[in-house]
Regions:
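Gly/Ser-rich oxyanion-binding loop with an adjacent helix/lid
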Residues: 6, 15, 108-194
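ATP-dependent small-molecule kinase catalytic core of the GHMP/sugar-kinase superfamily
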Residues: 153-281, 285-295, 299-301, 314-339
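Short Gly/Ser/Thr- and Asp/Glu-enriched loop/turn motifs at secondary-structure junctions
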Residues: 304-310
């Protein structure tokens, strides 16, 4: 892993400059939408913190109309404005500072901008709202400045806002390759040409409030202190390859088992950190135990969990009625339904 200051903005700025024209001005107000995503094979740990490069590849499924709507237009005041879910945020807040820093990579004349984001899912609750938020912001900036960048470049740029944002530029299944180059130019996401209309996801809410520790802080703590982390990158890379193969084969049982094992291995690695890091709550384990009991009865349902307490169920349409009846607080998502 490359040890460099996390506040060193010169390196990301150079990466943006390589893809953006020297003369750049806001052409028009713009709006964009990006879906949130759930990783079926997860990344945890970075080989370069400044460039936001992962130690392992990952693969996700996007969440259709669960995501972020973002609008950008000139501000009516002399300074930037950042709005989230209808609330104007203090400019010194962590979220606003991240948005403004990202805007600064694009603009040249420092024209004050107003950014409005509305999430259709709980913010900071383990549902990757930062991923959809920065993906939508990247797409909106591409439109606002009339850049017409290809999606592989947009994916690389979105990475500087949130690693998982690289995967939220598309619907469906998306793979983010870790890349090998030191400059990160080969670390971007790509959509997989895999259509699976029967595929379902259900979000079982456990805690929809802010997490006690951000994913970024939790990741850094795990990498630095967990004795189990040394085996994670190689296993996670192998899991990503195997999940991809299971998808191509439409082998749902293998896909589900791999995704669940990958998530549990990640949480075990976090819980082995010193001091322990545990995002899961007692109700999370209750949901898992209910799911495992259902599987013993022949129901092909699997689980995955990101850095949060909520449990995501993976199943096919044949199990949808059972899931709705037995996990009655769950919200079922059909990723391949047309909007």
């Amino acid at each position: 892993m490359t040890e460099r200051s996390l506040t060193d903005s010169t390196i990301p700025a150079a990466c943006f400059a390589a893809h953006l024209p020297k003369r750049l001005s806001l052409c028009q107000p713009a709006a964009a939408y990006a879906p949130s995503n759930i990783a079926l094979a997860k990344y945890w740990g970075k080989r370069d913190y400044v460039l936001n490069l992962p130690l392992n590849s990952s693969l996700s499924i996007s969440l259709a109309d669960w995501g972020s709507h973002t609008q950008i237009f000139p501000a009516a005041t002399a300074c930037d404005e950042v709005w989230l879910n209808g609330v104007s945020l203090p400019l010194d807040s962590v979220f606003a500072q991240k948005i403004i820093s990202f805007l600064n990579f694009f603009r040249r004349d420092m024209l004050p901008l107003r950014v409005e984001t509305v999430n259709t899912l709980p913010t900071a609750a383990g549902l990757a709202s930062s991923a959809s938020g920065f993906a939508a912001l990247t797409l909106a900036l591409d439109k606002a400045f009339n850049l017409q960048l290809c999606h592989s470049v947009l994916s690389m740029l979105a990475r500087f806002g949130s690693g998982s944002a690289t995967r939220s530029l598309w619907h469906g299944f998306v793979r983010w390759d870790r890349g090998e180059k030191q400059d990160g130019s080969d670390s971007f996401a790509r959509p997989l040409a895999l259509d699976w209309p029967e595929f379902r996801i259900a979000i079982v809410p456990v805690d929809t409030g802010p997490k006690s520790r951000s994913s970024r802080d939790g990741m850094n703590h795990t990498v630095a202190t967990s004795p189990l982390f040394q085996t994670w990158p190689a296993q996670a890379e192998a899991d990503c390859t195997d999940v991809h193969r299971a998808l191509e084969a439409r082998d749902f049982a293998t896909l589900g088992a791999l995704s669940e094992a990958n998530a549990l291995a990640l949480h075990a690695t976090m819980m082995a950190a010193r001091p322990a890091l545990c995002y899961l709550k007692p109700q999370s384990w209750s949901v898992l135990e209910q799911l495992w009991a259902a599987r013993e009865e022949g129901h092909e349902i699997y689980a995955t969990m990101d850095a949060g307490a909520n449990v995501k169920l993976l199943f096919l349409s044949s199990e949808e009625s059972f899931v709705r009846h037995n996990f009655f607080t769950a919200s079922v998502i059909r990723p391949f339904d047309q909007p």
